[in-house]
């Protein structure tokens, strides 16, 4: 399982590289506990908690034992998620944003984003479309999941039909961490082959290590995991917006961000 570890590179990434993920103080809880989770935006697995604003959310729900529950929150709530599961199992929290947009005034900043996320031959495509290399407008969408162990934490993650998403093919709360955790990255419910997966590994003391992997032909990668650590996986794709789809403000490019968070119990 080859990993490429980064160090100071991630200490000062610009805002275009920010991830959005679902985070909490404890990814393992009992069924009668109230679970509180933040929507966080930042980098290097550190960021600010985002308030609940309905206008920014396309869907936000949690799934446990084959039942789906809509998130109940008030405008401005921090944390954005609060729920008491009431039974044991593997709880999956799913968040999908409405589209937002930003403008890159010059090509260098946009290209840094392209290179960081390994998004392919975007410059060649951009030029071929007859677009200028200034004032590049990008629309972006977030598709974030969190997998929480409740009690005995029996169960499995599954596909939720997001435009892009990670699916855990194992259970990090019950499986042997020495075997690694198999995950799959999807786009429109199909495997993303040879996709870059960015792995953020947070130790109990808050130290974060960052590494990269690539998915295989089936969109699958095996992640090295350690007891007592929390993980954020991130994968981004960039596509030409569909001109026939009213998908938010007009843009030259559209990015889709998949993220999943989970933890591994202490040994």
Where in this protein do the model-derived segments appear?
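Sec/Tat signal peptide C-region and signal peptidase I cleavage site
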Residues: 13-17
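Start-of-domain marker
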Residues: 18-73
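Short beta-strand/loop motifs in extracellular/secreted proteins, especially
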Residues: 56-58, 193-195, 231
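Short amphipathic beta-strand segments in non-cytosolic proteins
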Residues: 58-68, 196-212
């Amino acid at each position: 399982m080859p990993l490429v570890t980064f160090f100071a590179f991630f200490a000062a990434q610009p805002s275009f590289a920010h991830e959005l993920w679902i985070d909490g103080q404890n990814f393992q809880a009992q069924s009668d506990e109230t679970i509180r989770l933040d929507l966080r935006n930042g980098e290097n697995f550190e960021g600010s908690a985002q308030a609940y604003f309905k206008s920014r959310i396309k869907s936000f729900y949690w799934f446990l034992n084959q039942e789906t529950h809509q998130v109940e929150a008030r405008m401005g709530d921090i944390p954005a998620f609060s729920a008491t599961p009431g039974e044991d199992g593997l709880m999956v929290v799913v968040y999908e944003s409405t589209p937002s947009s930003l403008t890159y005034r010059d090509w260098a900043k946009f290209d840094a984003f392209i290179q960081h996320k390994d998004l392919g031959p975007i410059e060649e495509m951009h030029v071929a479309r007859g677009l200028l290399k200034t004032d590049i407008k990008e629309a972006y969408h977030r598709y974030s999941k969190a997998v929480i162990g409740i009690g005995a934490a029996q169960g499995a993650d599954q596909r939720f039909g997001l435009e892009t998403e990670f699916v855990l093919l194992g259970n990090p709360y019950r499986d042997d961490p020495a075997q690694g955790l198999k995950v799959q990255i999807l786009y429109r419910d199909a495997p993303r082959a040879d996709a870059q997966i960015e792995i953020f590994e947070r130790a109990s003391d808050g130290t974060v290590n960052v590494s990269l992997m690539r998915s295989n032909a089936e969109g699958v990668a095996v992640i090295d995991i350690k007891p007592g650590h929390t993980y954020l996986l991130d994968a981004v794709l960039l596509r030409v917006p569909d001109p026939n789809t009213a998908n938010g403000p007009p843009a030259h490019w559209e990015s889709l961000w998949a993220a999943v968070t989970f933890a591994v119990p202490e040994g």
